[in-house]
Amino acid sequence: MDHGVSGDLIVTDGTTEVTRFKEVIEDDSIKRIVVNVSGGTDSPLVIYFLAKFISQTKKYDKEIFPHFMVDTGNMLTIAPTLVPKQIDVIRGLFPDVTIHDVYTQDFLRKEDWHDDLQRYIPVSKEGRHFRSDLYDDVESASLDGIKNLYCEPLKKNMWEVLKPDVLLNGKTSNLPNNTLKLYGADVSQPKARAAGETEKWPQEKKDRSPWYKVDKRFIGHQYRKENLMDNLFPLTESCLVESKGELIENGLKPDAYPCKMCHQCVEKFVAFGMYDKCWTK
């Protein structure tokens, strides 16, 4: 049984098969492939397999365009410096494939920004709801952790500038709730990605998300299988905490980043045995 990548462009862990890459590679009308990236582990793996399969099939007329919408109000993230390094690693592995420089667009969630504190603050301390979370259209946001209220015009601009034939992202299904609870994450976030919910997505959304029916454990398997733990994984960042003030509000020290408590930290640890910065505890 194949526990990695089969010869027919299908990514598998021996149980679940991901076929979206095969569809994109074999569709000769698709030349310009945009991948929304976030700095985490899932989206660079999409770029990695696209590049690998383009190289494998010698379909060099296909080009990859990474697109990154940067929340400038996140005071802790170093993802804007990590993402170009992720791309360089993949370019080094597949130098014959055209992977463009990251197309970056910035935004600030003005509804959530506190001028005096110089950071984002939630509307209510208990609910941890941000004002921009309260808009109805956030439910259909195409990037997790990105507030649709401010990203919608950026996405429209991306379509006009990059003119993609197909748009992909790195969304996965969340881990099962019982697994999350074992590690202290009581709520599956975002809820639309709770285990089993992604199967209910419309086909268009599934087509944008090659990993929609797998969770982070599948991603971890591929990193190990493809020998990406030493070169690509250390360049990923997943923690959702956005400021030292938020760390303190959660009872942590101001330098306790990654927090090891948020949904993304828990999922990363379950799948990889490590948090951001390759911390193991």
What are these regions (language model features)?
Residues 1-281:
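Nucleotide-activated chemistry modules centered on ATP-dependent adenylation/adenylyltransferase
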